[in-house]
Swiss-Prot record:
This is Serine/threonine-protein kinase MPS1. It is an enzyme of class 2 (transferase). InterPro entries: Kinase-like_dom_sf (IPR011009), Mps1_cat (IPR027084), Prot_kinase_dom (IPR000719), Protein_kinase_ATP_BS (IPR017441), Ser/Thr_kinase_AS (IPR008271). Its EC number is 2.7.12.2. ATP binds at residues 406-414, 428. One of its GO terms (molecular function) is protein serine/threonine kinase activity. Keywords: ATP-binding, Kinase, Nucleotide-binding, Serine/threonine-protein kinase, Transferase. Residues 274-293 have a biased composition (Polar residues). Residues 400-693 form the Protein kinase domain. Belongs to the protein kinase superfamily. Ser/Thr protein kinase family. One of its GO terms (biological process) is negative regulation of mitotic cell cycle phase transition.
């Protein structure tokens, strides 16, 4: 263009103290007045800047940055700008460029440059900081007083509202706090001839202005001193869109900490009064007609607690009201504006943080999606778990944290858990799906037995339980379950919270025999007697309750706080009141501990009676446990296969091998438990009175007699067979005299006299023997 040839020579590099030109709003002259400005006026302006400059991080009571929303009635005037107005704006740009060059050499020490441009055309000044435009800028409110004053000056209103909505042109107004406060003072007085500190930046993104603005970019350069003051950048697009940018003093010279918040005004009323925006980075609520869809915090370190308490909504949202407008603004801001205004000057471009470059059009889609998800949740939606099932079990509303798995088998698991009161328990989890109803019935029946045995010290205690299949549990407890042939099809679990035991009897025996192995030692009888008595007492407890366990083995006796307790009633059976035995439908138990009648259940014996299982079956299992405690193996451990075990156990002529022991009562006790005929087996009350547990106490006279004979035997010597024979005869006559042959002539008194005579003869003979030994010596 012709006007561009008359531009002054651009300096190589503008000084760092260069600031943007300040436009005098009340000047009506068409020529430049910057060169004729008096030094006194310059000092007044510097003093005004220092007076109204707020501290960057202190709370002040001074007037903050405010933005005046243009009345709706001015929109039609702004949209009817003609080509001549654009030409005059370009002239002003050229003139402003010339004045900026003159100002560079005028005063470098004051760090302030003033340029006054007069004319009817709108003034355009290059922005002080180069940055990538973001449509999410902060909106500012200038207040009611500023709106009233600005409306009185139509010329200023026309300059501040140079909007071209149909051609995607945008005008950006940048004002700092000092300029805003000074502008209110100047316009409020109206009659004072002080220069206004307000500056207007009108940037046109397309058409002829884009080339002129790109050239001004290189001339103005960086303004670090000017950036030390907080300032705002405002823009208005059309009649319903407005954006503002707050530039903190701490962000100079780059805009790394700037705040960009975009708002959409939906058909704003001409009398709308937007709320003031706080200058400390807090986001106020939007005007009543605005909706929320996007949030951008002013600072990375800002938190929700920093939001003002007066806000109605802690988040600033954007509602997508017009799709075509949104697409037009997004395109105009991201591509044409960014490229035409900032050009290719790398020094003037300030990169914003990547998290602040959020597309306006993408955020409403996320909020809409969130609303759809929220609306899809109805009363029928499953309730989300408030705990991690991999770390916790929930039984009847109580949480138990997993500590480790104790054991598992089939579809059952036993876990070590801890409750909320820091108590350790064992949690048994049984999966019901796929199991036959008979087994499921037995597991549910175990709960009933444990509830019945609650409070028994030698029976494991049930703390809590839950059966997910409530119908199955109710049928079992009521005894009305009829379908026992099929399998459970629904997903169901049984949770049982039990006492936690340190170790079971099987592991105790394994450790005990590992210590004895390789030595000549045998099992400690006191240790054996102590735990055998506890085993008998535990089984006696369930027998008194008419319950047959049917699966007694070392693993089902658990050591809890030093005492053995009976566990696992999964296949236990209750004995009817009118019988002493029970009849089973199938063989149950562990092979090495099963009784002969358990193998031959439902068969007939030699008398034609049906073989049933009962209390004697548990006695056989107890005999196998005692045999393992004494010898370290079961009675039929040498038979490996099922059929080999079945053959020897069901054979009444098979004799169990008992190795020689120091205590013959222990062998006798095992024989009383392992009698093949179930009617010959001792009952538990009798076993508790067996001499192994209750050895007989000898009478005092007998002890003295034995001691006397031992002294006589020592005096006679071990080589004197005749004397030892007489001593043995005397012991037998005194301890257990054999009855004499029956004689009808002699009565009992005569027989007793004969026994005494016999004792006397032996004593006389023994006395003579002792005297003969003394004569020989």
């Amino acid at each position: 263009m012709d006007r561009e040839d008359n531009l002054p020579v651009q300096p190589d590099k503008p000084p760092k103290s260069l600031v943007r030109p300040i436009l005098n709003l009340e000047t009506t002259s068409s020529s430049s007045s910057s060169s004729s400005s008096s030094p006194e006026l310059l000092r007044h302006l510097q003093a005004a800047f220092k007076r109204h400059r707020p501290l960057s991080k202190m709370q002040t009571t001074s007037i903050g940055p405010r933005r005046s929303v243009a009345p709706q009635r001015q929109a039609s005037r702004n949209t009817r700008l003609v080509t001549a107005e654009g030409q005059r704006s370009q002239d002003v740009v050229t003139l402003s460029q010339s004045l900026a060059a003159n100002t560079l050499t005028q005063d470098t020490t004051n760090n302030l440059a003033i340029t006054s441009v007069a004319g009817e055309s709108a003034s355009i000044t290059q922005p002080t900081v180069s940055e990538h435009f973001n449509p999410s800028d902060r909106q500012m409110d200038f207040g009611k007083s500023a709106v009233t004053s600005l409306e009185s000056n139509l010329d200023v209103q026309r300059k501040s509202q140079s909007l071209i909505g149909t051609s995607q042109d945008m005008e950006w107004d940048a004002t700092n706090q000092a300029e805003a406060s000074h502008l209110d003072a100047c316009i409020g007085s109206k009659h004072q001839n002080l220069p206004s500190v307000d500056s207007e930046v009108s940037l046109k993104s397309e058409y002829k202005d884009s080339s002129s603005l790109a050239k001004i970019q290189g001339q103005l350069g960086e303004f670090p001193n000017f950036l030390n003051q907080p300032r705002t950048r405002c823009s208005a697009v059309g009649s319903s869109w407005a954006t503002t940018t707050l530039i903190h003093s701490s962000s100079a010279p780059m805009l790394n900490a700037t705040t960009h918040v975009s708002r959409s005004y939906v058909e704003a009323d001409s009398n709308a009064n937007p709320h003031a925006v706080q200058s400390q980075g807090n986001l106020p609520s939007c005007c009543p007609s605005s909706k929320v869809s996007n949030i951008l915090h002013p600072n990375k370190d800002a938190t929700a607690s920093e939001m003002p308490a007066s806000t109605n909504d802690p988040e600033v949202r954007v509602k997508e009201t017009d799709t075509s407008k949104q697409q037009q603004i997004t395109t105009g801001l991201e591509a044409p504006v960014g490229s035409s205004i900032y050009g290719s000057d790398g020094q003037a471009n300030a990169r914003l943080p990547e998290e602040l470059h959020t597309s306006v059009s993408s955020q409403p889609q996320k909020s809409d999606k969130h609303e759809k998800v929220a609306s899809s949740k109805g009363p029928s939606a499953p309730r989300k778990r408030n705990y991690d099932p991999d770390l916790f079990f929930k039984v009847n509303g109580k949480l138990y944290q997993r500590l480790g798995k104790i054991g598992s088998g089939g579809s059952s698991e036993v876990h070590k858990v801890i409750s909320s009161d820091c108590t350790i328990y064992a949690l048994k989890k049984i999966k019901l799906k796929g199991r036959d109803y008979a087994t499921a019935y037995g597991f549910c029946q175990e709960i009933g037995y444990l509830k019945k045995l609650k409070g028994k010290t030698n029976i494991i205690q049930l703390i809590d339980y839950e059966v997910t299949d409530k119908t199955l549990l109710q049928e079992v407890l009521n005894g009305t379950m009829s379908n026992k042939d099929g399998r459970v099809k629904e997903d169901g679990f049984i949770y049982m919270v039990l006492e936690y035991g340190e170790i079971d009897l099987a592991h105790m025996l394994s450790q005990k025999w590992r210590e004895i192995e390789g030595s000549d030692r045998t099992i400690d009888e006191n240790w054996l007697r102590f735990y055998w008595q506890q085993i008998l007492q535990a089984v006696n407890t369930i027998h008194e309750e008419r319950i047959v366990h049917s699966d007694l083995k070392p693993a089902n006796f658990l050591l809890v706080r030093g005492f053995l307790k009976l566990i696992d009633f999964g296949i236990a059976k209750a004995i009817n009141s009118d019988t002493t035995n029970i009849q089973r439908d199938s063989q149950v138990g562990t092979l090495s501990y099963m009784s002969p009648e358990a193998f031959m259940c439902n068969e007939s014996d030699e008398n034609g009676n049906t073989i049933k299982c009962g209390r004697p079956s548990d006695i056989w299992s107890l005999g196998c446990i005692l045999y393992q405690m004494v010898y370290g193996r079961t009675p039929f451990a040498d038979y490996k296969t099922f059929w080999a075990k079945f053959k020897v156990i069901t054979d009444p002529n098979h004799e169990i091998t008992y190795n020689q022991l120091s205590n013959p009562w222990l062998i006798d006790l095992m024989k009383k438990c392992l009698a093949w005929d179930r009617n010959q087996r001792w009952r538990i009350p009798e076993l508790l009175q067996h001499p192994f547990l209750a050895p007989p106490i000898p009478h005092e006279p007998q002890v003295k007699t034995i001691k006397l004979f031992s002294l006589i035997a020592e005096s006679c010597g071990s080589d004197d067979d005749k004397a030892n024979s007489m001593i043995s005869q005397l012991e037998q006559l005194l301890s257990n005299p054999a009855p004499l042959p029956r004689n009808d002539v002699l009565d009992s008194r005569d027989q007793n006299q004969q026994l005494l005579s016999r004792v006397s003869e032996l004593c006389i003979q023994l006395q003579d023997r002792l005297q003969g030994l003394e004569g020989e010596n």
